[in-house]
Structure formats: C-alpha cells, structure tokens
Amino acid sequence: MKTTGRVNGIISNIVIVKADGPVGQNEICYVWTGDTKMMAEVIKVIGDAAYVQVFDSTRGLKIGDRVEFEGHMLEVTLAPGLLSRNYDGLQNDLEKMDGLFIARGSITDPVDYDAEWEFSPLAKAGDKVTAASWLGEVKEQWVMHKIMVPFTMTDSYTVKSVAEAGKYKITDTMAVLTDAEGRDHEVTMVQKWPVKQAVRCYTEKPRPSRIMETGVRPIDTFNPMAEGGTGFIQGPFGAGNTVLQHAISKQADADVIIMVACGERANEVVEIFKEFPELIDPHTGHTLMERTIIICNTSNMPVAAREASVYTGMTIGEYYRSMGLKVLVMADSTSRWAQALREMSNRLEELPGQDAFPMDLSAIISNFYSRAGLVKLVGGQTGSVTFLGTVSPAGGNLKEPVTESTKKAARCFYALSQGRADSKRYPAIDPLESYSKYLEYPEIREYLDEHIEKDWVDQVYAGKTIVQRGKEANDQINILGDDGVPVEYHERFWKSELIDFVILQQDAFDDIDANCPMERQQMMYKMVLGICNQEFAFADFEACSQFFKGLINLFRQMNYSEWKSEKFEGYRKQIEQYVSEQSK
C-alpha cells in the first residue's frame, strides 16, 4: 500500500509533508491542489516530516492538501522513439503540450506507445544473459536501437524464448528470461531507470584512448577532447558559449547528441528547435535532428526541474552508450544547475559554503562528471559518453565556486575570453588559459602519433610557446612603443598573430570554414608552424607587419576555400612563393 500524507508547511517550492508511513530519500510523490497533481521529490526526511521539492509553481497550495508517495525515485523511460524528441527536465514531451506556456501539472508520455517497430532478434533460446545484454534490435532513425535486458535485472539469466522478426509495439513481450531459481521474467522494449543513479552495466571503464573530432580548430588542434572525456566551456555572457556549443553539436563525430538546455534563454532553445531539423549531418547525410535529443528547461521554467534535466540527459546518454554508440552530452549551462542546488540548499537552511552554494558542491559536480566515460560492454563492444558543459559565472569570474569545482572534475577547460570576444576573435577560446589534460595521456599521444603525425603533441606545445612569446612581445611593444623594441619583437608578435588568425579563429557561419576536418587542420597547422620556425630579415617593423598582414590575408582566403580544390591549391602555391621571396 502506498504511503500518503498531508501538507504541513510551505516554503516557496519546498513543501513539508506529514507522512503516515515510510518515505525514502529522493522518492517521487504527487501533491494535489484541487484537480491538479504536481510532481515532487523528497529531499530530506526528519521523523514523520518529509521535505519535498515541487517541480511546479506552488501557488494556491494550502495546508492539509493531499500528497501521494510513489515508492520509487525520479525515473526516465528508456525505449525506442527517444531520438529527435524535445523534452522538459522531467521527460515530458514538449511537442504534445498545447499553449505558449506549460500548464501546471502537465504530464505527457515520453514515447509513443502505439507505434510499431521492426524487430530483429540477436539472442537465441539457451543464451546466458545479464543486465544490458542485447536481445534484439530495431531501427530508430538511422541508429540500430538495441533491445536490452533491463538494467534493474542484476542477476544471471537464461533466455527461454525471443520474439521472431516482425513488427511489435514497445509494450509487447520481446523475450522471456529464466533466473537461477526457475522463475520466468518477461522483457519488453521499455525499461525505467532512476536518473540519480549511474548505469554501471559494463565490465570495464578504461581510460580514453581516442580523440573526438569536433571540426573546431582551436579545440581539435590545440586542446583536443577525448572520446569518453569530460570538458567545460567557461566564459562571461556574450563571449560565444552557445554558438560554440551549437557548432560542436552540429559537427562532432558522435552517433547521438543530447543537448540539455538547463536554465537557458528561450530564444536560444528555439534556435535549436528551428535549425536542427533543417541542417544536414555531414557524417550521415541525414538531418541533425535525427540523431539529437533536446532536454529543455528555460529560465522561466521551475528552478527545481533544472536540477533534474541534467541528470535526465546523462541517464539517456548512458542508455545509448550501452548500445555501443558514441554519445555526446552537452549541458548549457551548469552554472544555472548549481544555482538550483543553491536555492534548494538555502531553503532547507543547510550550512552555506562559499557564495552560499552547498558545502558539498564539489562532490556533486565531480560525481556527475564521473558518469561520462568510455566503457567496455558485457558483450565485448565499446561505447562512450563524452560530456561537455558550460559555466557562465557572473562577470566572467574564474575564481567562483562552480568554476573551481568543475576544473577539478573536468579534464578539458575552454576559457572564453571577454577581450577576444570584444575584438571579434571567434571562437573566443583563450589559447593560454585553456588546456586539455588528455595531451598528457600516453594512450592519446600514441593515437595522435599514429593517426595524425609523429610527435604531434610536441608540435602543439611548440605552437603554444609561439603564442605565449608573442603575447610577451606585444606587452613590451605596448610599453616601449613600436620604435622602442628590436624588429625581432615585432616578428615574434606577428608569428603569434599568424597562428591566431589562421588556426585559432574560425567562422562558424561559413559553410566551409565552420567544419574543418582533422586532415585539413594537420596540413594547415604544419604549414603555419613551418613559417613560424623560419627566420626573416625585415628592414623595420612596418615591413614586418605588412608582410604578415599579406600572409594572413592569403591564409584566410585559403580557409574559405574548399579542401583540395583548385582555389585552395592556388592559394597554397601563392603562400609558398610569398614566403620564399621574404626568407633569408
């Protein structure tokens, strides 16, 4: 019998409930006000008083209103039909909702229970299976969606029977499994899993050993992201966080993209809704929306649901990872998720940490980031979840708690600089502040040596040194004036500008320059580095700046030319001739 209770106190969206039976931490309940039922989550239990966080506005709620406890945590529905859907943080399908604003208590089905799917069996009677073992598959968009033993079935089972190939609804029985005690268990295409728990149905979690191409030069060349890795973009408002995330989501070498718009402005989310169904995925030739799931909690939606949306996105990512797919989960912005945690902590009157964030903020963020990763599945295949979050601290403050905690958890850091954004150097990734710890991994070094070029990491560090020395030379020029420093200082500065303009800047709105394949990046970078390592003889600083401005212009035209086209090769020859005329 389910536990029930009555509302005993209200603090904004935290409701104190006097329960008449046992209540668990993180248990889901429904609070009734009139004919409307609102979902809520238990966040603290003291005696017979349960503190529940309501995922809707509590306006009109009164003392004595009825509460029903469900006996399970916040769960997501995992089944074929998730791809190309738009959900809110509680996995309600936004397309099925009417009106400009979401009505209070709106609950819709996350998947279509009446749709039929073409099933092909992969297992056979007599096979031994465990949680996440593949029983069959259906074609969802262009992805082969595996039907698995539910993650909750943790024992070892023997397959008694599997459905024959044909069309089935997701609620039909696909297989019957027998446990060690001889009991039969029916398995359908649908399963549920609590969002706060990591899916651990794999045999091994090795270190990342491959890079994930994004087509964005300052990331792939200077600070690569590993497949199954973690990273975050930090930058003040207006520095291009969202445009960079959209560029990565369009071009990343992943099978499934999950975008979590957590506390984002509504117009940025609408942009994704409008653009993605029209854009073509360069890897498959299908529309981008076919491989994308959007989980959206905009700024004007309830704060409590923001926290849930990030976990919902990660859980769906882990589900697709269990099918042996490469998944990219992107959250914009985790700062607003942390603000939701702060609001909850403050209402519970917990001891505040720095800037009133919860004391355990660092542990919460680290625990969440640890759910990403490359895994070896029970069948021997590999799957991965790569996580990329954004942090938007007030005033671009790098020392605030969310940035500090995320830096400890994530292995890649992309710092967007206000100065670079103001001077229109997009993407505004600061080459000196940003880093990728994956460059230190022997596995990644081996991969880069084998797939790009021998000693590639050393060449990357050489480029970073040129940029650093150019910045130092620029500081000296600004202090002493153009005539007050040797011409070598100007040469050093302009070499760093060459790397900046050609490699670190990229036009996200140009069809060709927006997506730069790794082969092209390697060729361009080698060319630029070769010029930077040459010695030139300039009469004065004006001759130096004129030469490099002309060179940068040729390279920029080359960036806008199609890879290996006549135009591209023409610019390459022009550059070689231009440089040879000036060389010592």
Regions found by a protein language model. Name each.
Residues 1-103:
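N-terminal accessory targeting/assembly segments
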Residues 12, 38, 47-50, 72, ...:
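Metallocofactor- and cofactor-centric catalytic cores in central/energy metabolism, strongly enriched
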Residues 14-18, 50-56, 113-124, 158-162, ...:
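Short alpha-helix capping/helix-loop boundary micro-motifs
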Residues 19, 33, 70-71, 90, ...:
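Conserved "cap/hinge" positions at secondary-structure junctions
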Residues 43-49, 80-91, 142-166, 184-199:
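Short, compositionally biased
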Residues 97-152, 169-229, 244-247, 282-299, ...:
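P-loop NTPase nucleotide-binding/switch module
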Residues 221-222, 228-551, 556, 564:
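P-loop NTPase catalytic core
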Residues 546-583:
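Long, highly charged low-complexity segments enriched in Glu/Asp and Lys/Arg with interspersed Ser/Thr
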